[in-house]
Amino acid sequence: SLTGRDRGQLMLVVAEEGDFLLLANGRARRAENPKRKRRKHVSLQGPCDERTRLKLQSESRLTNSEIRKALALWTGDENAN
């Protein structure tokens, strides 16, 4: 996130709604209540792991635990679950 109270936080894009992205991190921003943010206020950092990508593409919802695990894998912090 580039702006707002969540500036600098790493989040996973869980869905898209036109010019908006729905972001979650599995803790403060949970899967059932993702943050709605304009694309221009978000810096895309890179792709997620294959398992997470396939689950998102299959239209099934990620759990908060799966979101935290995907972010931990991306940052290399295996103990951040």
Feature map (PLM): residue ranges:
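Ferredoxin-like alpha/beta domains used as RNA- or RNAP-binding modules
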Residues: L12-N81
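Short, charged/polar N-terminal "headpieces" of proteins
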Residues: S1-E16
